[in-house]
Amino acid sequence: MAETEGFGDSGSKQLFAGLSNVSISGDIPVEGEITVPMASTSQEDDLSTLDEPVKDTIMRDLKAVGNKFLHVMYPKKSTTLLRDWDLWGPLVLCVSLALMLQGGNADSKDDGGPQFAEVFVIIWFGAVVITLNSKLLGGTISFFQSLCVLGYCILPLTVAMLVCRLVLLLSHTTASFIVRLVVVTVMFAWSTFASTAFLADSQPPNRRALAVYPIFLFYFVISWMVLTFNTVS
């Protein structure tokens, strides 16, 4: 054992003998940083809403919905609707449009119940069908991103419905119908253009027409419902 320990000590001395004359000059600064950056942790803390007041959370969500409304009214190639998707805005627009379509001649006997259900089902079922068609054609966006865009782009038609109701309160003449026709046509084109501006780039170039055509039909059906609405006389 003593011989083994002596052999080990001599081997260690020979191994580190060459390092005994190595020195670091005082003129050469030794630089470096051994601290671990905490940027990712701070970002996660900023995004956490566990300690955030409910009022701040609601105001932030309302601001996000308002920003998406602006993107629809001024459509351009942007990823805001796709990146920060939500279904609160589409739900509000769908309910608002269905409520404004109540009270027409077609559903006066039923007190507007079926009309509300028709609008609600047409909008959401149509959006789901368009989304599935987009995915089957090779679209690159997710299911809920497509629903978000299609739902938010109902905003122009909701505005058209509001204008049509105001016009019908004034008169039921041919001139009022022409005004409603112009408003609905413009808003229909606006909704179609806005939705395709967000969704067209997510489709393969040779299949974009197949993806845009159902969107055209979707907003055309909603526009027809808005145009043919007539209050109870």
UniProtKB/Swiss-Prot annotation:
Keywords from the named record: Golgi apparatus, Membrane, Transmembrane, Transmembrane helix
Membrane topology: Multi-pass membrane protein
Keyword Transmembrane helix recorded: yes
Entry's transmembrane regions: 85-105, 112-132, 143-163, 181-201, 209-229
Cytoplasmic side: 1-84, 133-142, 202-208
Annotated family: Belongs to the YIP1 family.
Protein name per the record: Protein YIPF6
Record carries keyword Membrane: yes
Organism: Xenopus tropicalis
